[in-house]
């Protein structure tokens, strides 16, 4: 499970590999909050994310992370707050992310950092390993709850 650039992925928390990043309740209107959800044999479209390169390359590449079900962008709305999928311009910096390797114990995992540095990294709240945990944009510490697997779909 590694990030290979643009493509469609199930994004999985390192500290809870039985869960995935999920646009909660599969809503088609803007603003769905993002939480963890139990992985199944075949992920639903609200648990799949299209990663699209929008600027830069290599370590400075910026990506939009687009929910396959709704078409809305993963967005950090404010620091230490749950991320969501609002209707927002693709040029808005809060909808842009960098993805960096953070290999841990020989596992190929990554951090997902918001372009707005004050908005930090994609983070599972309180290191939760339970379905329904909020996914935040929190201060970047590259902790285990801020590392992710990318499972190509």
Curated annotation (Swiss-Prot):
Keywords recorded for this protein, A-Z: Lectin
Domain Ricin B-type lectin per the UniProt entry, residue ranges: 58-153
GO terms for MF: carbohydrate binding
UniProt binding sites for beta-D-galactosyl-(1->3)-N-acetyl-D-galactosamine: 22-25, 46
Pfam families, per the entry: RicinB_lectin_2
Keyword NADP: no
Signal sequence range: none
Keyword Transmembrane on entry: no
Gene3D superfamilies assigned: 2.80.10.50
Top-level taxon of origin: Eukaryota
SUPFAM superfamilies: Ricin B-like lectins
InterPro entries: Ricin_B-like_lectins, Ricin_B_lectin
Known partners and oligomeric status: Homodimer.
Role this protein plays: Lectin that primarily recognizes glycans with a non-reducing terminal N-acetylgalactosamine (GalNAc), with a preference for the alpha- over the beta-anomer. Can also bind non-reducing terminal galactose (Gal) residues but with a lower affinity. Strongly interacts with glycolipid type glycans with terminal non-reducing Gal or GalNAc but fails to bind sialylated or fucosylated forms of the same glycans. Strongly interacts with galactosylated N-glycans, displaying highest affinity for alpha-1-3 branched mono-antennary N-glycans but also binding to multi-antennary glycans.
Protein name, per record: Agglutinin
């Amino acid at each position: 499970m590694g990030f290979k650039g643009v493509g469609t992925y199930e994004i999985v928390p390192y500290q809870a590999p039985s869960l995935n990043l999920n646009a909660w309740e599969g809503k088609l209107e803007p603003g769905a909050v993002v939480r963890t959800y139990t992985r199944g044999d075949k992920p639903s479209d609200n648990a799949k994310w299209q990663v699209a390169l929008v600027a830069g390359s290599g370590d400075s590449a910026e990506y939009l992370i687009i929910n396959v079900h709704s078409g809305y962008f993963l967005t950090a709305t404010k620091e230490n707050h749950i991320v969501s999928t609002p209707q927002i311009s693709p040029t808005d910096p809060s909808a842009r992310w960098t993805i960096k390797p953070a290999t841990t114990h020989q596992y190929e995992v990554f951090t997902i950092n918001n372009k707005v540095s004050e908005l930090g990294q994609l983070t599972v709240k309180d290191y939760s390993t339970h379905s329904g945990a909020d996914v935040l944009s929190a201060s970047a510490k590259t902790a285990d709850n801020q590392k992710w697997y990318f499972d190509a779909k």
